[in-house]
Amino acid sequence: MRVEYGSVEKDGSADLDVDWLADGWVALLRRWLADAEAAGIAEPNAIVLGTVDAAGRPVTRTVLCKSVDDTGITFFTNYGSAKGEDLASTPYASATFPWFALGRQVHVRGPVTKVSAEETADYWSKRPRGSQLGAWASQQSRPIASRAELLDQLAEVTERFADHDTVPVPPDWGGYRITAEVVEFWQGRESRVHNRIRVHDGRIERLQP
């Protein structure tokens, strides 16, 4: 169950250092995303999204990050889903990119806001039609009697939009942006003496593992 990570001496892999953030956290995160994609990691933009419900109980799930910029990271979902309800009561979240095969992870946390309708529409237009229909068919996080019933709902919306060249954005669907209040880069190293670099309040600092 234990994984041994690399080191400069062991495999020649360079140590994560504050200098790697000379161009800012966005540049390094994008570079690591590209490295994960090049390594063949499935869905390298997957994040473990953490929220808390109205009672303060934490919940995590995996979603896909769809954009990274100087303001933060963005994902899209059903606003009426469990995560949407959590964010309505506590608009703060954490997100972790877990690249186990590379011995890397990046953690982002901060306040959450909905993106504009224009940004949602732009992303929606790039989704495959099947994904668009699936978003209409599913009342996300709500109970359903069977998969057959879910497929019936999909068939119904497929028929409803059969004569439409484009499928409109559902009224309860859109994006959220996590404003990057804290960003932490982690690199697994030999003997569990890992590298951790945190960006917070304009400061870049090394943390003990």
Swiss-Prot record:
Residues noted as binding FMN in the record, renumbered to the chain: 61-66, 76-77, 83, 105, 140-141, 186, 196
GO process annotations (BP): pyridoxine biosynthetic process
Entries under InterPro entries matching the protein: Pyridox_Oxase, Pyridox_Oxase_CS, Pyridox_Oxase_N, Pyridoxamine_oxidase_dimer_C, Split_barrel_FMN-bd
Swiss-Prot/TrEMBL catalytic activity: pyridoxamine 5'-phosphate + O2 + H2O = pyridoxal 5'-phosphate + H2O2 + NH4(+); pyridoxine 5'-phosphate + O2 = pyridoxal 5'-phosphate + H2O2
Enzyme class: oxidoreductase
Cofactor(s) recorded in Swiss-Prot or TrEMBL: FMN
Pathway named in the protein's UniProt entry: Cofactor metabolism; pyridoxal 5'-phosphate salvage; pyridoxal 5'-phosphate from pyridoxamine 5'-phosphate: step 1/1; Cofactor metabolism; pyridoxal 5'-phosphate salvage; pyridoxal 5'-phosphate from pyridoxine 5'-phosphate: step 1/1
Cofactor: how and how many bound: Binds 1 FMN per subunit.
Keyword Oxidoreductase in record: yes
The protein's Enzyme Commission number: 1.4.3.5
GO molecular function: FMN binding; pyridoxamine phosphate oxidase activity
NCBIfam families, per the entry: pdxH, PRK05679.1
Subunit structure: Homodimer.
Family the UniProt entry places it in: Belongs to the pyridoxamine 5'-phosphate oxidase family.
Physiological role: Catalyzes the oxidation of either pyridoxine 5'-phosphate (PNP) or pyridoxamine 5'-phosphate (PMP) into pyridoxal 5'-phosphate (PLP).
The name this protein goes by in its record: Pyridoxine/pyridoxamine 5'-phosphate oxidase
Organism lineage: Bacteria, Bacillati, Actinomycetota, Actinomycetes, Mycobacteriales
Gene assigned in the entry: pdxH
